[in-house]
């Protein structure tokens, strides 16, 4: 466990995370969090989704608050491997991820991918059924495809974008990619792959109580038929086929079956579906898209000012160290860090996006 200097010059204990799960949403992250909590080498954050680097938490809390969530019960953070799982991190922009890499350059990244149609539909079930308490069977096709079209949902399914942003920032060796199908069909192999990547002891057997646990089973939460309406299935395939083709190129054919299946589904079309697609994309979804973009422009400005506040909070006069960069950071390194954090320059810190 690392140490750093407080603003008074005293050494204080730090428990920064050594790994983070970045999604994707609806890909078994709750199940993985519960399983990893049982491993003797690992200290998970005391709540599953910290979301610190995304928006609200970072705006209202500092790094001391964040790191405190990784402390052991005795306050010493004795377990060598610490992490959090926040699937929403997969939607972060490149400039945000680059800044995380400045803070935590040795972070190990876990990413789980699920068939895009299954993932998008699972999210629809969650949002309409579990969160809104509606019977999805009674939700209109228009409402369902509008939900698919939402910017945040499309970002969660654009796996190539996520992979490129995070591997550019941390280097491709830092990123562990696996599939929801393996989690579902062979949990031991899936979990041990994660453990090896983050440096935990292997082999390790998944506790028996988790082998029969459905992964956030939305059918039990909502109580409805989970069959995807044909028009919704076609709409998702039409919307996500090109991003999935780009993903397949990046992964050198590892998701060819997804591409083939989505091409078949997309080919089964009719005029009314195509009309619905155009109306949704050019009319119905426009207000939400504009509102989303405007909100995030404002959020970026607030985050920028938040980092300025963190700088003032942790930097003392003269050559005192800055907590963000550890015990031997100087005021010069502080300025270098902050200026680098503000810049939104493209390009990898190390490595490239080849997988």
Q: What are these language model-derived features?
A:
Residues 1-89, 103, 107, 117-142, ...:
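PAPS-dependent sulfotransferase catalytic core
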Residues 20, 35-43, 50, 93-209:
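PAPS-dependent sulfotransferase catalytic domain
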Residues 53, 159, 255-258:
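Short clusters of hydrophobic/aromatic residues that line enzyme substrate/ligand-binding pockets
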Residues 277-307:
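Short hydrophobic helices that act as membrane-entry/anchoring signals
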Residues 164-281:
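The conserved 3'-phosphoadenosine-5'-phosphosulfate
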